[in-house]
A protein has these predicted regions:
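Chalcogenol-based redox active-site neighborhoods
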Residues: 1-153
Length: 153
């Protein structure tokens, strides 16, 4: 990988992402909101699709919290998946033209998946302070959803 996940207790690194509406978002756009970044290689893999569905269910019960499902997929693919699946509680964001992977230390730099993002979860509070991080050790495994949610309590 290209670095280390943001450290717990520190502020999120500066980043930009692109939404399915092709709008760029940055740290400033998330100020005042709690955020969960569900980071993964591609929406077109079964585990990534499953985590997006599960976080969509979780998002329905969270107050003042936005969940961003982040991958290097083009925004069109992300939007198509959520539209087809009827997922309206999560937001998708693409790292395809940004520094996000490097800033969060999740760019895969070796293996057949070189160039996409590792599977990870980063949770931050309303001020952008990191509450929880998880780098999923096996790319085909799901993240620890409970740990992410419990970090918001």
């Amino acid at each position: 990988m290209s670095g280390k996940l943001p450290a717990k207790g520190k502020l999120l690194p500066k980043f930009s992402l692109t939404t399915s509406a092709l709008q760029d978002i940055t740290n400033k756009d998330l100020a005042g909101k709690r955020v969960i970044f569900n980071i993964f290689p591609s929406i077109d893999t079964p585990t990534c699709a499953t985590s997006t569905r599960k976080f969509n269910e979780i998002a329905a019960s969270l107050q003042n919290t936005e969940i961003y499902c982040v991958s290097a997929d083009l925004p069109f693919a992300q939007g198509r998946f959520c539209g087809t699946e009827g997922l309206t509680n999560v937001k998708t964001a693409s790292s395809f033209r940004s520094n996000f992977g490097a800033a969060f230390g999740v760019n895969l730099t070796t293996s057949v998946l070189k160039g996409v993002l590792a599977r990870a979860v980063v949770v931050a509070d309303e001020k952008g302070k990191v509450l929880h991080t998880e780098l999923v050790s096996e790319i085909a495994s799901e993240p620890n959803y409970d740990a992410a949610i419990n970090s918001l309590r």
